[in-house]
């Protein structure tokens, strides 16, 4: 029986032990049945393949890696808690409180009554929310929301915060730029207020109580300046009449010579012809003093002098004659001016006038050369310094001055 077991054993799985080990195994099989459990132990150990053990060893770090990675933040959160919590809480702690100066100058675009109705401050809130409230307040306080709405800068991306305005029968929306810091809010509002001509309207610090008194003083000064402006404009409008009244003394002596009547007296004569009945006894009686006493008392007067109420036709004819006598020089000067502003259409006489008018001292003595060489507008634009010095005989200084005026003429818009 034992010989039959041994060849059967060979037909099975080959043993990994040496020949002495085979003999030991043979002795174990030949032993009693009670020793059979001890024989099974090496069989179980031998059946375990090596690759299975290695695979388990390799699988253990893979299986343990997730739990090792998950507790790492828990362990690292203890020393990093002081650094991570402020970084997470920084956006929450970033708030702005914007104060409104109700005593500031509202400017021409904002309505002062509506500015007075605004709250004392906006916030403390997120910078984007405070910016939206401030810009919306400017739009709501505007006389014309369309003008203020057009001054708001368009923003893109990020946290979309928009303002609205109603004009042209529609509701318009515009998104504000992305807010990154408190300084950006202040710079944005400073530019907006500068364009609205209402500086010092917003601030991140509360305004002192004493600013109202200073603003009142400024308002008083502004009122005084406005009154001064109105007075000056009224004086400017009324001044010509007053000047003509006081200029009667100077023009009274010129009544004797109709050809040399002062131009200021013509306006005064017009005023007399319009029907001032209280000056019928002689216009100079109110302002002339002793010079006009012979006229008012009926004494001898200069030939051709008549009260304006009695001879308005003669006064008008004399005024027209005086205008014609005093205007020939001006008309002649206007006639000499070029008819067209385009120099390419100028004639020789127009070029002569231009050269003489550009620099009378340096170029005035040389105007006859332009007439002699028949230089018109097109030829004038083609002149250069070397040509002027060579053909016209001008020195370097006048030639450079002439070229300078020609360059300015080329750059001008016709």
Curated annotation (Swiss-Prot):
Residues 288-354 form the SAM domain. Its main location: nucleus. Residues 257-343 are annotated as: Disordered. Residues 257-276, 312-332 have a biased composition (Polar residues). GO terms for molecular function: chromatin binding; histone binding. Coiled coil: none annotated. The keyword rRNA-binding does not apply. Residues 284-304 have a biased composition (Low complexity). It holds the Pfam family SAM_1. Keywords: Nucleus, Phosphoprotein, Repressor, Transcription, Transcription regulation. It is found in: Nucleus. GO terms for biological process: negative regulation of DNA-templated transcription. The keyword Transcription regulation applies. The modification Phosphoserine is found at residues 55, 65. GO terms for cellular component: nucleus. Belongs to the SCM family. Putative Polycomb group (PcG) protein. PcG proteins act by forming multiprotein complexes, which are required to maintain the transcriptionally repressive state of homeotic genes throughout development. This is Sex comb on midleg-like protein 4. It comes from Homo sapiens. The gene is SCML4.
